[in-house]
Amino acid sequence: SGVALGEFFTEHTENVPVNSNEKGEFTYYVSRKKREFVFDENTFKGRLNKFFAFVKDKYYDKRIIIATPLHRAYAYFGGDNIQQNELYSNRTGEYLESYVEAIRKAADIWSVELIDLYRESGLFPLLDKSAAKYFNNEKTDRLHPNADGHERIADAVLRRI
């Protein structure tokens, strides 16, 4: 599966006033680039913009925190429910890291706190010893953390809040 990344902004050129006369009438304009938010529900970045626009409007006076996902490794849950590790792209040709970078950028754009579990949890299920210690099943489920893995996540969250 996969959702296209998309863009956070579109960009166009607009004439803007930079000078006025004593009556307050604009007398001189220059051309400037201007960005507009993209709220395209068919793209990941558009969805992030739509989500944060809603949350920042509705909860304008609250602390808002977003977290990145963990690193991903192989998981098999039977039938066609097979999750490949992050070294494989999704069907749109993007890797997990691109979505993580988009979440980091969205936190910057929308001025929300970020807990970067991808970077700061220390969980790396691509390696056998890490998978055996911190994930449900070294052979079939390197996607879901076990109790030790959840403790690492909790520690990373507590360091940030």
PLM-predicted stretches and their roles:
Residues 1-161:
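Alpha-helical cap/lid subdomain in secreted, periplasmic
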